[in-house]
Amino acid sequence: MPYWVYSPHSGGQKPKPAVQDRIRARILKHAAKNYAGKYDRIDVRFRGALCYVDAYTKSSPDPWRLVRLRYNGDENSMTFAFYTYSHEKYEPSCFADGSDHGTPEDAFDIGALYLN
């Protein structure tokens, strides 16, 4: 008999445009405050329930893929996947405190390791 298992890295819901704007603004404000000079431009884009965050630098014509956030109805409790260049895909991850859910800013901090 099949059984159901909770996965924080599946499903989700598409955030409304106002929520998308707030999430984008939060990420950009956090990046400008804490990582100024380490990137030229941060790109935040949405596709369905997912929010992709990339950074552009002068040293590379291609973007640095940082993280992919998943919106589950609460912009303060999102899940995320870290982009691994060794496998060239997003891998589900947990936040620094071990939780599956956290803020967009906390997810950006983890992805920003590529900016150092």
Report residues per predicted region.
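Mixed-charge, Lys/Arg-enriched low-complexity segments
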Residues: 1-22, 81-116
